[in-house]
Curated annotation (Swiss-Prot):
Its EC number is 2.1.1.190. The active site is at C403. One of its GO terms (molecular function) is rRNA (uridine-C5-)-methyltransferase activity. It comes from Hahella chejuensis (strain KCTC 2396). Catalyzes the formation of 5-methyl-uridine at position 1939 (m5U1939) in 23S rRNA. This is 23S rRNA (uracil(1939)-C(5))-methyltransferase RlmD.
Length: 446
């Protein structure tokens, strides 16, 4: 028998906000219970309504700000109070980045008992139109005979009824009503659950997931939309491996972005992982290479290398670079990008980097050898197994690019036991207006 959900208090309460949680929510207390208040800032007095209740804490959302923080601003997006895509549009970018830096340092201190010798200035960029990769939910609402396209509401599985998205690349974020109308015009409009957005430097693609076959009339409508907007249309009838380009019929399935500082063109499929913020990606690369300092005689290991975003820039300076990635498809993409750019001093391998490292003598693990330096860019789960055996590679310098400060701190603590010292750390604002923290850390062998 399922447990009956506790009924939420209906009356709003007044909260004195004491601090900000790592997730960017105001923290208060009432009757010995912690309150997390969405949309509230430290030092503010607000009225808030209950949206969720747990045994040890309650979640609330701001209704009215009675005493305002000096850095509170009017959100740039009219849908910010309802849409769950952003959580910090109510405060200026300076406050956001300072908060993210504090989160990073707190995690390093609490989880790794570490403090970097130097905290470097943050990498920051534009707060609008930065997002080149996103998954938009699609849902038909029968009561209103309307198709919604966008992100989920906060504290809900419903989609937010939006007409624009200022953080998305303009060619898509400014066309939400057109996307709604397009989906509604298709025969299977009730069976289209999502649209993937992926943009290169010169082309933006929409990958439309459709559960039912499309008619010839549907295809013509999609082609007409592509020609009117300049957006490429890809169709996905089943799993990711079924994605195929519908229009334009130019023989080019891949998108691309330029890394001009290194004379590189990086090609990728719309379903490949790429960094969502192209400007911050370029700044991140510059900082990573400055910290890594690849030299002409060195062999360097790039772990979780993806399609070669770090591998190929490093190869412009190093003698040899080895990229390792969990996906065979990404290994093939890495080799293809190397060939496209005339780079021959690289090799790519596929391996599950979350498992304990196998004996180096196994042929399929030929990449398990010594290196001068290591760069790693793991997913949110981090690189615990690699950190435990990092001395095996013999590297004197490690650059760790992180999308989760908690796992970075955990792995940094492990690296410290392996004899590596935390020299520098800093944040990168890859996702403005969210509490998401991207960071970079430099370790050197003590």
């Amino acid at each position: 028998m399922s447990r009956r959900r506790k009924k939420l208090p209906q009356e709003s309460i007044t909260c004195e906000i004491e601090s900000l949680s790592h997730e960017g929510r105001g923290v208060s207390h009432k009757d010995g219970k912690t309150l997390f208040v969405e949309g509230a800032l430290p030092g503010e007095t607000v009225t808030a309504r209950y949206v969720n209740s747990r045994r040890s804490y309650d979640e609330l959302a701001v209704e009215e700000v009675l005493t305002q923080h000096p850095q509170r601003i009017e959100p740039d997006c009219q849908f910010s109070k309802l849409c769950g895509g952003c959580s910090m549009q109510h405060v200026d970018l300076g406050f956001q980045i300072n908060h993210k830096e504090s989160v990073l340092l707190d995690h390093l201190r609490h989880f790794g008992d570490l403090k970097p010798e130097q905290v470097v200035p943050p990498l920051v960029g534009a707060g609008r139109g930065y997002r080149t990769k996103a998954r938009l939910g699609v849902r038909y609402v029968a009561k209103r005979d309307e198709v919604l396209v966008g992100f989920r509401e906060r504290y809900s599985n419903f989609l937010t009824a939006i007409d624009e998205c200022p953080i998305l690349i303009e060619s898509v974020g400014g066309r939400i009503p057109e996307l709604k109308a397009l989906v509604r015009s298709l025969s299977g409009y009730q069976r289209i659950p999502q649209i993937e957005v992926a943009a290169g430097d010169d082309m933006c693609a929409l990958v439309i997931r459709h559960m039912d076959p499309l008619t010839e009339e549907d295809l013509q409508k999609l082609i007409a939309f592509s020609e009117q907007t300049g957006l490429a249309i890809y169709l996905q009838p089943k799993g990711p491996d079924t994605v195929a380009k519908l229009w334009p019929k130019d023989g080019q399935e891949l998108l691309s972005y330029q890394l001009r500082d290194y004379g590189l063109t990086m090609q990728f499929h719309p379903m490949d992982f790429t960094q969502v913020n192209r400007d911050i990606n370029r700044r991140m690369l510059a900082q990573a290479l400055e910290w890594l300092q690849p030299q002409a005689g060195e062999t360097i290991l790039d772990l979780f290398c993806g399609l070669g975003n770090f591998t190929l820039p490093i190869a412009r300076s190093a003698a040899h670079v080895v990229g390792v990635e969990g996906s065979e498809d990404m290994v093939r993409r890495g080799y293809a990008n190397a060939e496209l750019n005339g780079i021959s001093n690289v090799e790519f391998h596929a391996a599950d980097l979350h498992l304990p490292l196998a004996p180096a003598k196994e042929a399929k693990h030929a990449w398990l050898r010594t290196y001068d330096k290591v760069l790693l860019d793991p997913p949110r789960s981090g690189a615990e197994e690699l950190a435990k055996q990092m001395t095996r590679f013999g590297a004197k310098r490690i650059v760790y690019v992180s999308c989760n400060p908690a796992t970075l701190a955990r792995d940094a603590g492990i690296l410290a036991t392996q004899g590596y010292k935390l020299i520098k750390a800093g944040v990168m604002d890859m996702f403005p207006h969210t509490a998401h923290v991207e960071s970079m850390a430099l370790f050197e062998k003590a």
